Amino acid sequence: MRNEIQNETAQTDQTQGSMFSFFNLFPFLLPMFEVIKMVVASVASVVYLGFAGVTLSGSAVALAVSTPLFIIFSPILLPAIAATTVLAAGLGGKKVAAAPEASPAASPSLSLLGIPESIKPSNIIPESIKPSNIIPEGIKPSNIKDKIKDTIGKVKNKIKAKKEEKSKGKSEDSSKGKGKSKGEDTTTDDDTTTDEDKHGSGAKHGKGESKHGKGESTHGKGGKHGSEGKHGSGGSSMGGGKHGSGGKHETGGKHGSGGKHESGGSPMGGGKHGSEGKHGSGGASMGGGKHGSGGKHESGGSAMGGGKHGSGGKHGSEGKHGGEGSSMGKNSLSKKKKEFHYRGQAMDASSTSESSDGSSDGSSSDGSSHGSGGKHI
């Protein structure tokens, strides 16, 4: 037992000796180690105290600064905190139907502020000043719209009535014009072969370029044919030249002896015109018309067909009137003398008219046809 105890003590001594063997080798380091411990402890304590002091001082400064600020703003902060807690707690419940005035917490904002219920907006504004009572019923938007619609309808009815009156007036005027034309249209020249029957003197049959007849040629003997009468065809026509003496004969111009004759429509139909009959140019004047003191006058609408012209005979413009064809008239023999009428560029070779006085001025007898060879353009 003693041996074991001695061995153990020896081992402990060895371990302890090994621990301090460094100092045994360097024994002068032992006092320095003590100094080092003191220095390290002091430095550590200073650092620790420094951090602690900074922390404490920071907190102290924070307290010193925040406390007066809190005191200054407390009148605002405290009500704000109270309102926030009230709203967050949800104390503003609805009034109970059984006991509406039992708890003041039913309207928390008013109860907290102490505002009595008698000065609520619904109680302040009287019913007499409410918008529903201020605006009378007659000025409501629905009534205004109805009035506007009524006025617009009245204006439209007035405009329609005026238009109808104007249309009636125009129809009456047109009917009067037609009556006049019908009453004055019958150009009955009984003396179709009298001494002063001028036909085609200075007359232009075309668009002002080719003249139909000489300036002073008298056609037949008898009453004036086409003197101062007006024949106006309202429509468009290609042959717009003048034909006739005294009275102008146009497809869109004037022709007739006596009263006015105006056809309301376009001259699309062949009307008849003679010194002894009626002159109506109401239809499409597409076919050849006849014109003579004893015959009929049918004017071509665009003067596209051959019109015949002559007293007793026929004066037929075989080409287009308004086109390029030359008008060559065929006449009937009346007396003994034959002559050729040269007009413009074309020769009226077929018009073998017998002149009563033998002159070449176109003063032909009753039955002679006046066929001029000028081109009708």
UniProtKB/Swiss-Prot annotation:
Keywords: Lipid droplet, Membrane, Repeat, Transmembrane, Transmembrane helix. Residues 196-222 are annotated as: 3 X 6 AA tandem repeats of E-[SD]-[KT]-H-G-[KS]-G. Sequence repeats lie at residues 115-124, 125-134, 135-144, 196-202, 204-208, 209-215, 216-222, 230-247, 260-277, 278-295, 296-313, 355-359, 360-363, 364-368. One of its GO terms (biological process) is reproductive structure development. Residues 350-369 have a biased composition (Low complexity). InterPro entries: Oleosin. 2. repeats lie at residues 196-202. Residues 115-144 are annotated as: 3 X 10 AA tandem repeats of I-P-E-[SG]-I-K-P-S-N-[IV]. Residues 38-133 are annotated as: Hydrophobic. The chain crosses the membrane at residues 16-36, 38-58, 69-89. Residues 162-185, 195-231, 247-263 have a biased composition (Basic and acidic residues). Residues 230-313 are annotated as: 4 X 18 AA tandem repeats of K-H-E-S-G-G-[SA]-[PSA]-M-G-G-G-K-H-G-S-[GE]-G. Residues 1-37 are annotated as: Polar. Residues 158-377 are annotated as: Disordered. The keyword Transmembrane applies. It is found in: Lipid droplet; Membrane. Belongs to the oleosin family. Many of the major pollen coat proteins are derived from endoproteolytic cleavage of oleosin-like proteins. This is Oleosin-B4. It comes from Brassica napus (Rape).
